[in-house]
């Protein structure tokens, strides 16, 4: 009997294995959305992808996206590790503000603001305080059993107040070429912030994928009970990821403040924690913990930054910017949802899977006679 034709009536042509493998890759949809945003900007501004060399530095919209997206990439990097353990860190925005405020305050009051020792000391102070914030978050979550959203929400509010106390509610301006290098300098024609972010992403990826750390994080986030039964000490691991998250936020704060040569305790890092969570989710990491994707997080952060650039290019009114961003992010999340894609595919095809039709009774009888003459 001739087998049914897959392209006949009542059937949908099956996708090639290569296509299924490509679309099933966790980085496919974030990369596709990023490419669509870039192509949309090209349609609006034909020289959007143009990169030129001026005064020995690379300039262009793509370079701007990478440079201004570097702080968000770092914050999202630490947020990914926290979310992978079924946690959340809402204090990263305040940590960004505190780090920038401490560094600028130290440089502004130093005898030699432009010297390397002064800048180095400012960086150490900022990173040290950020590590203490991460330790406090980890202690509240791992040792005292406080819900992560509650523990970090406390420091989100208190940390913003600390940043305002450091700056006395004013904007602290500094003049230090060495400090400016962190967020606004160039090295080998590329923005130093981009190189620094790429290096930290590479190191984090190497540590989490080439050592047992990544497996332990996924184990604790995927099944805390089972990981505890096999002897994994989750408390120390949780403290570690919160410290890493705070340090990433501190470096982002140094980038932001050095790029503008000032610290604003009121607005620096404001709502960056929400953009970081969006970047992590858009990148394919589930808020329920477990498996995580650092590459997807980087793509998610670039999507958020490209979206912000697109909003300015379109001239969207400021009062509707957040609504516009939310709508686009919802679309991105739906596109990545396997259930949504399956439902959309069924509706667009117009036909569901074919139910096998039983062979007529006469054919069955004839076959039996052939087998048993």
Summary of predicted features, one role per range:
Residues 113-156, 300:
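Alpha-helical transmembrane segments within multi-pass membrane transporters and channels
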Residues 1-46, 202, 229-236, 307-373:
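Cytosolic-side transmembrane-helix boundaries in multi-pass membrane proteins
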Residues 249, 260, 264-326:
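Transmembrane alpha-helical segments in multi-pass inner-membrane proteins
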Residues 48-64, 68, 163-166, 208-209, ...:
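Inter-helical junctions in multi-pass inner-membrane proteins, predominant
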Residues 27, 148, 189-197, 238, ...:
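Loop-to-transmembrane alpha-helix initiation sites
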Residues 118-126, 133-137, 190-264:
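Helix-loop-helix "hairpin" substructures at the membrane interface of multi-pass membrane proteins
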Residues 41-42, 58-109, 139-146, 280, ...:
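Single transmembrane alpha-helix segments in multi-pass membrane proteins
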Residues 144, 148-210, 237-240, 259-269, ...:
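Transmembrane helix-bundle core of multi-pass membrane transporters
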